[in-house]
């Protein structure tokens, strides 16, 4: 079989913004591999593409590092939190609570007791994805500000596991139960801020138009004098060559037409929010890993790197594709002929493979020939990379680095094994020793 050609310099994925090969290699040498790197200018450029919306509300679950959150806040971006921990992250990053512009909104499909106490204490608006949330908030704090997140009966997503609407999605209040939810709002005197619909459409503008029409229909059915609507998130990112780039102006214009229709009916301004996550940060981030082994296995050729799905979960969970490039230890690109390669990690887990499709089938991809010590760069990993990482196989969390113009700074140091073990070694109730079995 003839080896495929390596991508030309024009086809080779580019590092984001001010990040180049030598800077990446220098960061890897200083902080070790694997590590995450983000480019601040790329994030700012993505924010600017959405400035026509009244409120950009960052879905911090995409990348919740405090330094990224501070960057968002400095750019005037508001934040969405989906857990008590994310509320505390937003506060630690300098977000305030209160005010008409609602810097922090809490979105979920349930409220545990601790989080309920915290949102009530802080007065954070709750975007409710179940009727029980409305009832629980109302009992704890009559008059509390709320949104209603509606599941309109259809959905969209790049994977079945990311579909956020329809009867197979847990998210949102089923559209046929809107009246029941409004009755709870009335019973507890809750302050209904607006309606939220997180469906996403990517570049399917016909689908997006249907989503916008459904929002107008739901507001009419509600018959309430709301102050805002939220378009949710779901803006697509071109992960692979040939993926179309989303037209953010067209996206806004479709939503703005829906908003203007509501303004004419309600007789006052209606705030239009959007809730992007990966759109803002995916293209700004890369994961750099070192080649540690390579071997033929039957008809496949494996290159093994020191990052695993504990670091980058998306390929194993969704079958997601991330473009890769290869640099030598000094940061120069490898430009040799490509070879069909299976890229895999160090975990004691058969599914620890980066080149697989949804369902788990291994799919070799053309990769320039590598040497042990080279750096493999996984592109467009700024979203749902570090924030979804784990300590599986007792592997500590890895560093994060932010490149901002000429400055390169560490924004999360590498976790130590001692820190990983600490919660299990802290003083607690003494355990009665169990007798050892006689090995004979």
Curated annotation (Swiss-Prot):
- Provide the residue positions that the database annotates as binding substrate: 278, 314, 318, 349, 384
Where do the catalytic residues lie? 348 (proton donor)
According to UniProt, this protein's pathway is:
Amino-acid biosynthesis; L-lysine biosynthesis via DAP pathway; L-lysine from DL-2,6-diaminopimelate: step 1/1
**A GO molecular-function descriptor:** pyridoxal phosphate binding
Q: Which residues bind pyridoxal 5'-phosphate?
A: 234, 275-278, 384
| Composition bias, Low complexity | 421-431
Record GO biological process: lysine biosynthetic process via diaminopimelate
Listed under catalytic activity are:
meso-2,6-diaminopimelate + H(+) = L-lysine + CO2
* Enzyme category, top tier: lyase
Requisite cofactors: pyridoxal 5'-phosphate
**Residues recorded with modification N6-(pyridoxal phosphate)lysine:** 61
EC number(s) on file: 4.1.1.20
UniProtKB keywords: Amino-acid biosynthesis, Decarboxylase, Lyase, Lysine biosynthesis, Pyridoxal phosphate
The secretion signal range is none
Q: Where is this region: Disordered?
A: 421-440
Q: Which family does it belong to?
A: Belongs to the Orn/Lys/Arg decarboxylase class-II family. LysA subfamily.
Entry's PANTHER family?
DIAMINOPIMELATE DECARBOXYLASE (PTHR43727), GROUP IV DECARBOXYLASE (PTHR43727:SF2)
Q: Which NCBIfam families match?
A: lysA
* Binding partners and assembly: Homodimer.
**Function of the protein:** Specifically catalyzes the decarboxylation of meso-diaminopimelate (meso-DAP) to L-lysine.
HAMAP family noted in UniProt: LysA
Protein name, per record: Diaminopimelate decarboxylase
Q: Source species, please?
A: Streptomyces coelicolor (strain ATCC BAA-471 / A3(2) / M145)
């Amino acid at each position: 079989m003839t080896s495929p050609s390596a991508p030309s310099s024009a086809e080779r994925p580019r590092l984001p913004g001010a990040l180049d090969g030598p800077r990446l290699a220098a960061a890897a040498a200083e902080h070790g591999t694997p590590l995450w790197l983000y480019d601040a200018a790329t994030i700012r450029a993505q924010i600017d593409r959405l400035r026509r919306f009244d409120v950009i509300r960052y879905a911090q679950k995409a990348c919740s590092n405090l330094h990224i959150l501070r960057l968002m806040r400095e750019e005037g971006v508001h934040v969405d939190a989906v857990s008590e921990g994310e509320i505390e992250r937003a506060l630690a990053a300098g977000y305030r609570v209160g005010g008409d512009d609602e810097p922090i909104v809490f979105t979920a499909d349930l409220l545990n007791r601790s989080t309920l106490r915290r949102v009530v204490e802080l007065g954070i608006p709750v975007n409710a994805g179940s009727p029980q949330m409305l009832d629980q908030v109302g009992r704890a704090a009559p008059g509390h500000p709320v949104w209603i997140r509606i599941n309109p009966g259809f959905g969209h997503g790049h994977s079945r596991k990311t579909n956020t609407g329809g009867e197979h999605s847990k998210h949102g209040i089923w559209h046929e139960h809107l009246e029941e939810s409004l009755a709870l709002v009335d019973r507890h005197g809750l302050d209904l801020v607006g309606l939220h619909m997180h469906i996403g459409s990517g570049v399917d503008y016909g689908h997006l138009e249907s989503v916008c029409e459904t929002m107008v229909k739901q507001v009419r059915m509600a018959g309430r004098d709301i102050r805002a609507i939220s378009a949710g998130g779901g803006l697509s990112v071109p992960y692979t060559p040939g993926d179309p780039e989303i037209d953010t102006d067209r996206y806004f214009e479709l939503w703005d037409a829906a908003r203007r229709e509501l303004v004419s009916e309600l007789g006052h301004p209606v705030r239009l929010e959007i809730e992007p996550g990966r759109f803002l940060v995916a293209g700004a981030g890369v994961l750099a890993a070192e080649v540690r082994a390579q071997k033929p296995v039957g008809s496949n050729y494996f290159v093994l790197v020191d990052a695993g799905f504990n670091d980058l979960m998306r390929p194993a969970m969704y079958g997601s594709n991330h473009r890769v490039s290869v640099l030598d230890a000094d940061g120069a690109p490898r430009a040799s002929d490509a070879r069909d390669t299976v890229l895999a990690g160090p975990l004691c887990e058969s599914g620890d493979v980066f080149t697989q499709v949804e369902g788990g089938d291994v799919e070799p991809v053309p990769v320039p020939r590598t040497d042990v010590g080279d750096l493999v760069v996984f592109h467009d990993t700024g979203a749902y990379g570090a924030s979804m990482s784990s300590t599986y196989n007792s592997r500590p969390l890895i560093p994060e680095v932010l490149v901002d113009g000429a400055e390169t700074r560490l924004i999360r140091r590498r976790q130590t094994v001692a820190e990983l073990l600490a919660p299990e070694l802290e003083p607690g109730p003494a355990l009665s020793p169990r007798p050892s079995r006689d090995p004979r």
